[in-house]
């Protein structure tokens, strides 16, 4: 639905009922799979808006998207950490309430240059409602942050493209109970890229340099598996 065409405002709503059969790996992967897995079923509700407009001539666009959703999931299939290895398991009943917000814009500059920027934020409360007598009842699911987001900035010239990106993830829990001893700290990772594309005769070249984790942040995505510190890489592509 588009109630105000001149403002480029779209409103949408959705309901769907989904059914997911466990994959072959979910069932039989060595030490990880579980042959007792039940199919995952969910009722999903979503409502959202998208607004887009150019506020002045140099601005190509300004876009804002907001989506809110509620998912009621039965027998949710998850990878569940155990003492020595991970196992696939069903959560009997899970409710997921979430909000996604995305903002993006771009500007045209003189001399064939442009700048684009984007940012996204996700709020997701995914709680276990399986057993009211369990110590993890109404606790956040393992490895599911309540808050996460990212941002990116790209400056493009006829000669080179410079990019900066940032990813932020809030605290998580690596076991079912949301207690301090099970907490994994949140983190922010920043990356920088420099790239150039050019053509020589009929051959296209692309060279890209990346500086990853600029701040040399030490963090875990999975408990006890630390991610690398600051690193760099160079990638070259040739197309004939």
What annotation goes with each model-predicted range?
Residues 2, 11-14, 20, 40-99, ...:
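Membrane-embedded beta-barrel scaffold of Gram-negative outer-membrane proteins
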Residues 30-37, 84-91, 133-140, 177-182, ...:
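Extracellular loop and loop/strand-boundary signature of outer-membrane beta-barrel proteins
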């Amino acid at each position: 639905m588009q109630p105000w065409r001149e403002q480029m405002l779209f409103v949408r709503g959705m309901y769907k009922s989904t059914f997911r059969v466990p994959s072959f790996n979910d069932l039989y992967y060595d030490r990880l799979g579980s042959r007792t897995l039940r199919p995952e079923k969910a009722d999903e509700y979503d409502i959202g808006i998208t607004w887009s407009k150019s506020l002045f001539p140099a601005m190509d666009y300004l876009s804002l998207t907001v989506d809110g959703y509620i998912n009621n999931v039965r027998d949710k299939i998850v990878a569940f950490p155990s003492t020595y290895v991970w196992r696939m398991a069903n959560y009997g009943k899970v409710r997921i309430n979430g909000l996604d917000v995305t903002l993006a814009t771009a500007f045209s500059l003189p001399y064939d240059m442009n700048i684009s920027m984007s940012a996204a934020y996700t709020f997701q409360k995914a709680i276990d409602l399986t057993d009211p007598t369990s110590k993890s009842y109404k606790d956040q699911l393992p490895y599911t942050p309540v808050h996460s987001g990212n941002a990116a900035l790209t400056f493009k010239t006829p000669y080179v493209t410079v990019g900066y990106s940032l990813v932020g993830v809030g605290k998580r829990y690596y076991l079912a109970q949301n207690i301090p001893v099970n907490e994994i700290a949140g983190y922010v990772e920043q990356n920088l890229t420099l790239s150039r594309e050019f053509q020589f005769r009929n051959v296209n070249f692309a060279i890209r340099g990346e500086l990853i984790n600029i701040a040399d942040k030490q963090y875990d995505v999975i408990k006890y598996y630390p991610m690398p510190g600051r690193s760099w890489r160079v990638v070259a592509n040739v197309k004939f």
